Structures are given as structure tokens and as C-alpha cells.
Amino acid sequence: MSDRRWRDGSEDRIVSVLRAAGDRSSASDELAAHIDDWPTRYHFGRARTNLLHPIRLGPGVRVLDVGAGSGVNSRWAAEQGATVVAVEGDALRAEAAVLRCTGLDVDVSHGSATDLVDNDGFDVVLC
């Protein structure tokens, strides 16, 4: 099945912006400067992770992010100190997640969560 079923049409632009960005953090002013429509607000907006703030994450917490998209939630979880396994069904979105999470404890894979093999379990699942 084609990856395209998951796309909203913004993926090429999102990947391009992330490739060029020096600051890919959750609170990045650099990424926020690219917000000019709904898809860019979804991928670069700071407010999206506000829903995650009640979740207590830190070192030693393992997070599974199913349908990780461009890595917004994965990035935020890793910034809190968690170890993140991110699974994304679309190759371009998975590439965006890799770029967004570079340098953090995030393992991004392109594929289906049903194919995931992990014997260590997870403390938190995001989707």
C-alpha cells in the first residue's frame, strides 16, 4: 500500500524546513516562523505539546509513539528525558521525525506498529 494515504500534502515542505533548521526543539522560534497555514501550525506549532504536559516523563521512562508523524510528540518526550521508540507509516513523515529528533534518545522507524518487536515494554504510549 502506498505511503501517500497518510499525507496531507505538506510533507516535502516540512522536511525541507527541518533540514535547514538549526533549532528543531519543541519551543523553536525558528520553526514557528514558518507557520502560515494549518499543516505548518500542526507540525511546527508550540501549543500542540501542551496536551502532553500532565504526563510525567523523565529518565528511565520508555515511550512508544505510534503514528509519530513529523516527530513533534517524540521530540517533546525525549526533551523530558524519556527514551522514545517512534513508528510512522509514511516514509516522508518518518524522515521528518528523524530530522526533528536528531541528537535525542529517539529511535524512529518507518512501518507498522504491528511489526514492532520490543521485549522491554513501554511506560507510555502516544498516538
Locate predicted features.
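Hydrophobic or amphipathic alpha-helical targeting/insertion segments
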Residues: 87, 124-127
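A short acidic, Gly/Pro-enriched loop at the edge of an enzyme's catalytic core
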Residues: 117-125
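Conserved alpha-helix/loop element of class I SAM-dependent methyltransferases that forms part
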Residues: 42-59
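Conserved class I S-adenosyl-L-methionine
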Residues: 60-69
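Class I SAM-dependent methyltransferase Rossmann-like catalytic core
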Residues: 33-44
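Local beta-strand N-terminus motif with an aromatic residue
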Residues: 60, 106, 122-123
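Class I SAM-dependent methyltransferase SAM/SAH-binding core
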Residues: 72, 79-115
